[in-house]
Structures are given as structure tokens and as C-alpha cells.
A protein has these predicted regions:
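Sec-dependent signal peptide recognition
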Residues: 2-9
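C-terminal motif of bacterial Sec signal peptides marking the signal peptidase cleavage site
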Residues: 15-17
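Eukaryotic compositionally biased low-complexity/IDR segments
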Residues: 3, 20-21
Length: 182
């Protein structure tokens, strides 16, 4: 619960001043958006956070679902296990994260995601980097050393490494064909 509170607090701070759809949606609609990102046997008992970090529903398993990550609330929902909760806390705060010292983690994003640079987690300049917008996918955390044989090209087909040479490195597992942007 401590990690959920920390994520909630960090998310609320980051969302100050962001354009949010949250005020236009009911709590039940936000819960449906968030829980639609994972299989029902996970999301039905998960804790659900609003985009502002407040707890909309307490859960009874170790999963947390949210309607999106800042500033894209209600657009790219995800359900994450406890390892991903810790990763998100570090990512949101741009704090150190050592994948070699952490355990395995799973994140579901069955509704897809916004376009991101596969090379740099904080790049917002679409003229630089390798941009990819995934449809439904899983994200897996593990020691970076275990990902050495995976491709780095998000368009190669199958799992690939995102954000190599960065402490937020993780494995992407697309569940549909990843199309190159036009």
C-alpha cells in the first residue's frame, strides 16, 4: 500500500496543470477504462487509481490499474504488479532504478499506448529517435543482462527491448503487429 500511496502522490504532483479528461468522466467510467487494460481475472480485484492518483477502488490482490500515465490520463490504461509499481515510482520521479537488483515484473496494456521513443524515455521530439506506438502489449521487467539476445528494433516482430542503456529498460511484448508510423 505504501508504494500505491507514493505513486498516487507523484502522479497527482505531475498532473498539476495537465489537460485532463478525468473531470468529464465518472469514477465508474474511469474504473472501466483502467481495468480494461488487463484480463478480468487480474483487474477485477485490482486497486484502481484515478489520473490524479486518488484511489477509486481498493483491491484485494497485488495489482494496481490506472487509466493512463501523465499527461495521457484515460488514454493509455495499464495494470501493473508490485515490481512495476516500484518502477513507475522511479520513472515518474526520474529516480535511479537498478534492474539488475530487482525482480521480475509484469504490466498489461491491452488497450495500447501512446507513441514513445524506443531509445529515450524522456524524449518528446518526434524528429529524433525511433518512435513506436504499440497496440495491445505486455511489458516485462527483468535484469537488463537477461535481455541481451533480444532485438532493439520495435518493428522486427516479436518481443524487443525498450529504452536500452537506460535504467528504465524493459521488454516489450506486442500482442499485434506493430506498424511503422507514416
Amino acid at each position: 500500500m505504501k508504494i500505491i500511496y507514493l505513486i498516487s502522490t507523484a502522479t497527482a504532483i505531475l498532473l498539476t496543470g495537465c489537460n485532463s479528461e478525468t473531470s468529464e468522466k465518472t469514477a465508474q467510467e474511469i474504473i472501466q477504462i483502467a481495468t480494461g487494460s488487463a484480463p478480468e481475472n487480474i483487474s477485477a480485484e485490482a486497486t484502481v487509481l484515478a489520473a490524479d492518483g486518488s484511489v477509486l477502488r481498493e483491491g484485494s490482490n497485488d495489482w494496481t490499474c490506472m487509466p493512463g500515465t501523465p499527461p495521457n490520463e484515460n488514454v493509455n490504461p495499464m495494470c501493473v504488479d508490485q515490481a512495476w509499481q516500484e518502477w513507475l515510482q522511479a520513472y515518474i520521479n526520474q529516480a535511479p532504478y537498478d534492474s539488475e537488483a530487482k525482480g521480475f515484473g509484469v504490466s498489461y496494456m491491452l488497450q495500447g499506448d501512446q507513441a514513445v521513443d524506443n531509445n529515450d524515455p524522456f524524449n518528446t521530439d518526434r524528429s529524433v529517435g525511433t518512435w513506436v506506438q504499440e497496440g495491445p502489449h505486455l511489458m516485462l521487467l527483468m535484469p537488463a543482462s537477461l535481455m541481451s539476445d533480444l532485438p532493439r528494433d520495435p518493428y522486427a516482430g516479436g518481443p524487443y527491448v525498450m529504452w536500452e542503456n537506460n535504467e528504465f529498460v524493459h521488454m516489450m511484448v506486442p500482442l499485434e503487429v506493430t506498424e511503422r508510423p507514416d
